[in-house]
Amino acid sequence: MIVKTVKYKGFDGEDIEETIRLHLTKAEFLNLDLKYSDYGGLINYLRKLLTDVKDGDSYMRPMVTMLQTLILAAYGKKTDDGRFVKKVNGTLLADEFETSEAYSQLLIHLLSEEGLDEIEPLIMGIIPSDGVDPKELQAKKEQINAALNLA
């Protein structure tokens, strides 16, 4: 889990500081990693995008799309009993968060020149803290591909 604090002005001009919590379970990470398997997985695709954007060789659209996907998939809140939840009464918390100024500030900051250097550490903080063994992940991908006759 990673915790980010963003600051912004409220509608009445007041200063607001909001804490954002982002986390993916191993299953969520595996699902996202499979979506980017044509690029060598999520982390490899992220690194390629970062290199291309920093070198000026790429439009920002793929980076924006990836960040939106990851941030919204990982967004949730910590409960009083220490659990991390992404739904309340059947509603995804990310649905409301996506329209918030906090989300906007986080996304705009990450896409800024100084924010680009924060993207990889942010993503590495979102993935499961007990790590995802690359060999285990590859074996699971192969099992899924074999089951889907994609191997």
Located regions from the model:
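Sparse, context-dependent recognition of short Cys/His-centered cofactor- or disulfide-binding micro-motifs
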Residues: 7, 56, 60, 91, ...
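Short, charged/polar N-terminal "headpieces" of proteins
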Residues: 1-47, 134-151
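Structured domain cores in non-transmembrane regions
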Residues: 28-73
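C-terminal charged interaction modules
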Residues: 79-151
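Acidic-enriched, low-complexity/disordered segments with a strong bias for Aspartate over Glutamate
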Residues: 12-18, 33, 38, 52-57, ...
